[in-house]
Every structure is written in structure tokens, then in C-alpha cells.
Amino acid sequence: MGLLYALRVRIMNFMIFFLLIILMPGLPPRTTFPFKDYIVTPPKDLKGALESNFHLEGAERLLEGRVYGPECLIARNNEIYTGIHGGEVIKLTSNHVTHVTKIGQPCEDIYEESRCGRPLGLAFDTQGNNLIIADAYYGLWQVDLGTNKKTLLVSPAQELAGKSINRPAKIFNGVTVSKEGDVYWTDSSSDFTIEDLVFASFANPSGRLFKYNRSKNVSEVLLDELAFANGLALSPNEDFIVVAETGAMRLTKYHLKGAKAGQSEVFVDGLPGLPDNLTPDAEGIWVPLVQSADSEHPNGFTLFTRFPSVRLFLARMLALFELPFRYLNSVYPNKFSQRFVHFVGHMESITVLAPKRTTVVRVDWNGNIVGSLHGFDKSAATVSHVLEFQDFLFLGSPTNQYLARVKSPKAKQPTLKVRNVRVEGEGLEASIGVPPSKATPKPKAAPSTTTPKPTTTTTTTTPKPTTKTTTTTTTPKPTTTTTTKKPTTTTTTTTTTPKPTTTKPPTAKPSTTTTTTTTPKPTTTTTPTTPTPEPSKPKVKRTVPEKPAPVEEDIPSDTQPPKKEKLKVINKQGVNVEL
């Protein structure tokens, strides 16, 4: 009885405390939009195109310990450009790391990220030798790669338009450039910086999609209240653009041209994880999931979307927990307070709780999931970008201290190409006098010659007598051998049983066959009385091909050569004898 009473008292005390936290005005954090419920489609089951595999396992780790957080990857002239922690943009050539530029200020460590800067989105300009950089803290920049001249396009202090509320951008994230030079970019959150991503996961969606017009120096808002707007992908015809909503586990399509211009719709919904940067090509889009999610492993963005009071309580409790350290650091700046505040709010602190599964999804331009790559060994965890480059998939990440890569599933396999193949002896006269069977078409044979006694012509200078009967030959599967070095001697063995033709190959001669089109000497078919030798026929003059015969390759044959057997004939008494 006392235990139940104590439990009831504790529950009542917690409820009072809970109500005080969510109802008390003025408590941090302050958000643009009020906390309210919103719906996120549950992740799809790993079936069909999403079926699990192990393609991302055993990823090769490049430049380990030399790059920290290569978030976005773009390539040109066999060089990979990426932004890393510390605010630098670097390029990678083979095993070399070269500094390209830096937007932020000098800093000591990652906990000073707001001072260092954090380049997230990168794109090559279509109007010059420029690099467009979306720095999470310092805004949208244009950097001349030849002179390193930096031009600020959109400032973080600039108030930007919204569908209902105008406000500055807090997280400059994805960026892409159209053929005409217009820059599309995303603001992931209007309430929190990137070092407070945990708070952003509790707040209501406030992301935006912008189009920056260079001639007017104006950013036009296209979409508002996106659930952490992230990567971008322009369609091949640039008639629409796709934006990743990380917090909603979906891709949203915005029409730029045509009858639906200015309208948006869901492109892909229910992704099994949180999408990040998008990599488009002619066939579709690579969609990396920076954190996987399924029914057994829900993520923080979607766990309490239908419970705004719970999200508000958690956000305020977390803000109150770090409030003393923020105040201490403002009065007396110190590394301990800075590290603690950064650890509490930064999403990297909770990556240890992420599921083991790593997933990259392939989507076509019709919004269909056509394939996926998976891994479970965390050799390439928290993938934020996929770059298909030199038959590999390079995998960017905001947290890894290396650049991972795996073999591309679309890598071309080496193939053996044979051109202008000519058979040696091509164009010579046919040397087989046996008429073709009705069941199997055979090449046209030269007219046969009938002599009183049967003989078989060999390739030696002295004739070799053989005996041939007039009985009907039944061969279900004739063996055909083509040679390129020496002429072929053909010996036909006639039997009354359904056996393949028996061939007697000489030691220094190729296999004998029943049918061939490449032998240089004719074989005569006769009605025998008694076997007597005859002198060999004169050799047929060989027509030399205009082009040399192809080089022989040592490729194993699918069939085994026939064993050397003795010649079997039927004598007048009907008995099989061997010669």
C-alpha cells in the first residue's frame, strides 16, 4: 500500500513539474513557429528495391586521420573537393590533400565551430571558374578558384523572405547552380545553428528553399516550413528541383517550369532513414541516408512528431541543462564550457546511438526507388554524400575522420573484344564428299568421285589405305574441329549403331571430323570390294587470305578432344574388326 502511494506521489510531482516547464513563458529555446503536431510517413520495409545487401561493407578508408567530416563531395579534373571541420575547403588528388580556401576565422578545435565556419554545400559555378560554398555559419559565398577572390552572396545577418514570417537563415546547407547561373540553396533551420542540431530535431519545421538571382542580388523563397531542408538535385531538363527533407524522411519536388510551375509535391516518401545531400545524374539521384530508421529503430526527428508537448518539454529541459555553462562561458570564456555546450547540442554526440545499418538509396526521375545499397559493419557510417567517380562510390560523412569508398555497382567490367576474325583456310574448296543429312544442314560439298576401290587421302606424302563400307551411317551429334595450322584429315566410320563418327587423329595432326569446311584436301567416297592402296591426290592449292589469321589465345575449350582410338570396320562376314 505504501509503495503504491509513493509511486502515485512521484507521478503527481512529475506532472506538476512537466506542466510548469511547458507552460512557463520565456523559457528557452525560442522558435519561429509554435510547437504543434505534424505527420511523418513511417519508413518503408526493406523489401523489393530496398532489400538488404552488403555492398557497403568492407569500405576502403582513405586519408584516415587526415580529413575530418568530409560532408559534401564534388569532382573535376580528377580532383575531389570537400569541406571539413575547421572551416577549410580542400581538394584531394590521389593521396594528397591541398588547401583551397577558408571562409571562417582561425580557430583551435571543433568546439569553436561557430568561429571556424563549417562548409556544407559545394557546387561548381556554370558562369565562371568559381566555387559556390554554403557555409553553415557564414552564409553563401562565391570563390574564384584562380585568384581566391571571395564574394558574399547571402549574409547570415540578412533578413530573408518567408511564406508567412521573414527571418534570417541559421543553417546554410545545400546548394546547386543551374545552367543559366541561378543558385538554388537551402536554409535548414531558422531557429538553431548547426551546433544545436538536437534542438532543431525537437522544434517544428522551419527550413526553406531559395533561388538566388545574381542580376538582382535577391533570394526568392520557393518553399517554407520544410523539415530540415538539405540537399538539392536539379532535373536534367531543369524543369523541376528536388529537395531533401531530412526531418520528414522524404524528398519534395518543386516545379520550375511548365503548367505546374510554382507548385510542389511529394517526390519520395517513407525513406528508411534521414536523407542528406543529393547527387543527380542523367538516370536518377543517389540519396544517402545519414542515419537509418525503421520500425525497430525510430529516430529523434520523428519519434515525437505527434506529441508537441513532449518535444517542447525535452527541448526546454536540454536548454536549461546547458544554460549555466553558456552563462559561464559568456562571463569567463573557457574551453571546458565551450566543449560541454558543443557536446550537448551537436548531433555528433548521439551518433553512438544510431543503428548499425548504413543505407544509400537510388531513385529515378519519376520518383521511384529502383535500388539500394546497405552495410552493417559501420566501415562507412553516417553517409551524407555519394560521389560516383572513377568506378567507385566515394562516401562523404559529417563525422568520419576518413573518406570511404566502395566499388560502384555500375562499374564497367573488362570485356574481350575480337575484331576481323578470319578462319585460316577461308575461301578454300570444300574437302568433304559426304552429302549433308536432312536433320542438320551442312555446308555444300564438292562432287564425290567413285573409283573401284575406296581410299582416304591423308596429309602425308605416302598414302595410307583405309576401308569404307556403303552401310548407312547414323550420327546424332557430329563432331566438328577447326584448325588453323595444318590441314585436316577426315575419316568417316560407318556403323549401324547411333554413335558419333569415330575419328582417328594422327599424332602430329589435328582431330578428325565428319564435316568440315576448312580442310584443304578432298575425301572420296566409294563402294568398296577389297581395300587396296592408291596414290594420294594432288594437294589443293591454298588461297592465302588477304589478312593474316588471328592470334590464337589460350582459352580452354568447352569440350574435351576425342581419345585416340583404333579404326573399326565391318568385314564381309559382318564382324567388327580393328585395323
Curated annotation (Swiss-Prot):
It holds the Pfam family SSL_N. Glycans are attached at N213, N217. The chain crosses the membrane at residues 7-29. GO terms for molecular function: arylesterase activity; hydrolase activity; lyase activity. Residues 427-579 are annotated as: Disordered. Belongs to the strictosidine synthase family. It comes from Drosophila melanogaster (Fruit fly). Keywords: Cell membrane, Glycoprotein, Lyase, Membrane, Phosphoprotein, Transmembrane, Transmembrane helix. This is Adipocyte plasma membrane-associated protein Hemomucin. InterPro entries: 6-blade_b-propeller_TolB-like, Strictosidine_synth_cons-reg. The keyword Lyase applies. The gene is Hmu. It is found in: Cell membrane. Interacts with sturkopf. Transmembrane mucin that may be involved in cellular adhesion and the innate immune response. Membrane-tethered mucins are involved in many cell surface functions and form a physical barrier around cells to regulate cell-cell and/or cell-substrate interactions, and protect against pathogens or harmful extracellular conditions. This mucin likely acts in hemocyte adhesion as it is released from hemocytes during coagulation and is also able to bind lipophorin particles which form part of the hemocyte coagulogen. Gene3D superfamilies: TolB, C-terminal domain (2.120.10.30). O-glycosylated. Glycosylated in the ovary of 4 day old females. Phosphorylated. Detected in ovaries (at protein level). In larvae, detected in the fat body, salivary glands, imaginal disks and gut (at protein level). In adults, expressed in the cardia, and in regions of the ventriculus including the area posterior to the cardia. In females also expressed in follicle cells. It is a single-pass membrane protein. Induction: By ecdysone; in embryonic cell lines. Residues 30-579 are extracellular.
